[in-house]
């Protein structure tokens, strides 16, 4: 049975995973949601206006009232810079399974922040929420995301053809990864 805890603050060696705040809107826009290099790996298009980002962040904040909502802003400890987001979603209470997704601003790619955030959320999911399985997917054009998933202990489970259609109206194949609670606790 899933122990829903909402979006609890999580700290790692270099990061603070915390709730989004209204004051984050400009940085969310500037650091990843308006950047096509990041949005090319997401299902949704890059934001053209801060108003789009504002609407999205306000919706996230309004969902924090639910214990079943787990969406973190990723902040660096060293300079309090907001660099990305990560969330657990699509909970199946029958199986105890869910999915995870994340976005990191381009400036912070290849510095280990995605891996560090994902490891922390996987730990939170298994240790505190009693999840059975956490799954993730990345499009085949983004193998760096698969590397993050593997470093967090996930294993490749397959490829789903044309799993998503991106903002450029292109179908993308996605690689599926997963990690089971029992495997997490073996390591």
Residue ranges: model-predicted function:
Residues 44-45, 66, 96:
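Short, surface-exposed helix-loop/turn micro-motifs enriched in polar/charged residues
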Residues 60-73:
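A short helix-loop-beta-strand connector motif used in the catalytic cores of GNAT acetyltransferases and
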Residues 32, 42, 64-65:
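Hydrophobic residues in alpha-helical segments
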Residues 1-27, 31-39, 58, 75-187:
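Acyl-donor (CoA/ACP) binding surface of acyl/acetyltransferases
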């Amino acid at each position: 049975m899933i122990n829903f805890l909402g979006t609890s603050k999580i700290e790692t060696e270099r990061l603070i995973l915390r709730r989004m705040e209204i004051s984050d809107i400009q940085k969310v826009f500037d650091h990843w949601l308006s950047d096509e290099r990041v949005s090319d790996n997401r299902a949704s298009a890059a934001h053209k206006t801060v108003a789009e980002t504002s609407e999205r962040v306000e919706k996230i904040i309004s969902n924090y009232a639910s214990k079943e909502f787990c969406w973190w802003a990723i902040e660096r400890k060293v300079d309090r810079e907001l660099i990305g987001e990560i969330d657990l979603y699509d909970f199946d209470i029958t199986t105890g399974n869910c999915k995870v997704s994340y976005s990191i601003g381009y400036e912070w790619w290849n510095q280990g922040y995605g891996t560090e955030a994902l490891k922390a959320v996987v730990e939170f999911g298994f240790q505190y929420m009693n999840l059975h399985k956490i799954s993730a997917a990345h499009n085949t054009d983004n193998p760096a995301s698969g590397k993050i998933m593997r470093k967090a202990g996930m294993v490749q489970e397959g490829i789903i053809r044309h799993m998503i259609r991106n903002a450029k109206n292109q179908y993308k194949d996605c690689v599926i990864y997963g990690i089971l609670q029992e495997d997490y606790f073996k390591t």
